[in-house]
């Protein structure tokens, strides 16, 4: 799975509208996806009805595809990558 040095460590921040934001170091884009989707899964209790959370979860799964595609390509070039979709925002920054 030939990952470059830039992919070895990432700083990740994300925010969920109406819920909060967080940041952490992750090993690679796959770990970033797990952290993002896991955070959205845990946010379910913050919603009174299932519909907003289901939309948020769908957005997280779409963002996961973006992270594994254009996100990986951008980070491989040593550049930061960000995306926002339906109340969910993420920023990934390569660390040395």
What are these regions (language model features)?
Residues 19-34:
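A short, exposed loop/beta-hairpin motif centered on an aromatic-Gly-Thr core
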